């Protein structure tokens, strides 16, 4: 252990030596840079950009670029970065975390690597915890970047897509972590590439990196939509399929558990829902509901595939016979079963896109961060983000007095002592910052101070701007500020006149937070830049942390020594508290790691789908090659399921193949039973694919190439998006329910990974099938518009159309089902005299 500590300590010393050497090289260029005129300094930016274009790396430019940015800061901001700030900037450029104490000028430090990396032209994101700080820093530091000839954008929640696109197109973009994540998700839901706002993710510098990558790591970003308002449609589809007769209206393939409507069944469906053509792209929602109702009624059996109990449908595991709690069939099949069994159809709000901050920020080519407190989470940053935490020495020696904890037996005794301490310090004009863990504690102390007539401000992290304003004045003589969970991070507390003589800022902690890092943040508000200051934590045996980690022995020890109301100040107790905090931090790290492991399953799937969408949206030419692969996979699956080369030919179900092809791929009769008899499985596949190729060629002639390309895009995007949203929702249910399966020695994560993979595979096959069906069967219309997948469209009965004068019907001519009826009614043949034919 001692050897390990020595190693870590020595590597830290090595880092500092290397950084000092590099910073000295930058400082050596100070006179040369200072001699340049403003225009010549600005010209340097153009020169650097050209050198990057010609192949020089950013590392090659670091010393010169930092020297230019440093001189620029002096001229534009009146601030001249210290040596330690140059060191911090180098750490950030290298994609690590610079731990810099409060008041050491992190915001200015970040300008150096941000300037350098913006020279690549790929865009740099500066990330803050709230919009107030993003706005403030973009405005203040933007003066420097503009002076040096770089553009600065501010990405706020209220901006329109066009404004966001402009902000992201700038060399440097300030934003909150939430907005970046949501923009990424929204970009992967758009249907035209022009609607995307972000550029590929290159370099991000995160301010308060521990807050974003650690504290918020367990919170996923979710875009949810209203669930389908199609309860009625499930019920109608269910009622409709129950009127159908097997063989006449539909066929069932037992092997693949699939059901196909026959021509007659389709006509009945079109009449029942009062639509002209079920395969029209406008009617995909109806067709989907009919397909699921058919599956629910004719391939799924109660008490075999699922059970209905307590007003819900629960899935039965086919292998173990156990109920799979929390799991729901995807793509609306579960709702179709609910309609079949007459239980409540569940349509809660639907997760349409989701990502965790961990996985979002890991997509950047390079990630860096800065904070005053990261050392305690060093292992997490290394394991999850591959970032090292490097401590940057302070510019001036810290002379703050950090006192050992004061421990009381009861919570009341503790609060009385806190208020006494505040009153004493306030009387001599010393500013006091009181840190609490909960809002109730803030309010309790506030009411006690009111009773004593002590003027004070309370911060509860609600209004960021007012918060920053209060924090600015928190260092003035006689100021008392109560802050919950260190609200007001990001704004310095500067000491006012006469406060240094009063002892500087006194920080009082009313209990220890479960994370040492948060305690250190509170401490770090005092003693900035060599100022005097004092910090004191007050604890009681009734505090939550003490209760959770067995302080009964300590409590009885204190009572035995007659310390019931007095405080003890003991290093032993402080050490016990710290070890309790370490245990909590360990638990929290494990839980964040677990969130990441679960999200990694979805991450891999998300990357596949988003990549496919991106290719479709950006495709300039026909997507036929991609679509033909999907058709081929579908045909392979149908043929091998019904005519496997591994089974004797007498067991083949050739009629099943014909039924599927007729219903989903080609006009009825294009492939007949005679065509595929006495052929091998491979020959059957090739025969069907050849016929499909001919039909595809014919389809392509119906529209000009650009319009046909657009038709292909519409089909692909609509199918992929519908299936993906359903899949995410199903994965959500699986994630929620996986822990309820407490049988055997199952590992929930392994179970989630394997089931999630199966569900993804099923979704991909389902995408193939639907794309094949719509491309081959949908009626092609001009001026098709891509639209974001809209759920649960209402089914409107057809508007009354004026009667057209009917013409006599000539029986001898061959009329296609979708041709206009020769009687002149204006309807399609199948919906008019075709019914009688």
UniProtKB/Swiss-Prot annotation:
It comes from Listeria welshimeri serovar 6b (strain ATCC 35897 / DSM 20650 / CCUG 15529 / CIP 8149 / NCTC 11857 / SLCC 5334 / V8). Part of the Sec protein translocase complex. Interacts with the SecYEG preprotein conducting channel. Has a central role in coupling the hydrolysis of ATP to the transfer of proteins into and across the cell membrane, serving as an ATP-driven molecular motor driving the stepwise translocation of polypeptide chains across the membrane. ATP binds at residues 85, 103-107, 492. Transmembrane segments: none annotated. It is found in: Cell membrane; Cytoplasm. One of its GO terms (cellular component) is plasma membrane. It is a peripheral membrane protein. May bind 1 zinc ion per subunit. Keywords: ATP-binding, Cell membrane, Cytoplasm, Membrane, Metal-binding, Nucleotide-binding, Protein transport, Translocase, Translocation, Transport, Zinc. It comes from the Bacteria. It catalyses: ATP + H2O + cellular proteinSide 1 = ADP + phosphate + cellular proteinSide 2. Monomer and homodimer. Part of the essential Sec protein translocation apparatus which comprises SecA, SecYEG and auxiliary proteins SecDF. Other proteins may also be involved. NCBIfam families: PRK09200.1, PRK12904.1, secA. The gene is secA1. Its EC number is 7.4.2.8. Residues 800-817 have a biased composition (Basic and acidic residues). One of its GO terms (biological process) is protein transport by the Sec complex. GO terms for molecular function: ATP binding; metal ion binding; protein-exporting ATPase activity. It holds the Pfam family SecA_PP_bind. InterPro entries: Helicase_ATP-bd, Helicase_C-like, P-loop_NTPase, SEC_C_motif, SecA, SecA_CS, SecA_DEAD, SecA_motor_DEAD. Zn(2+) binds at residues 821, 823, 832-833. It is an enzyme of class 7 (translocase). Residues 791-837 are annotated as: Disordered. This is Protein translocase subunit SecA 1.
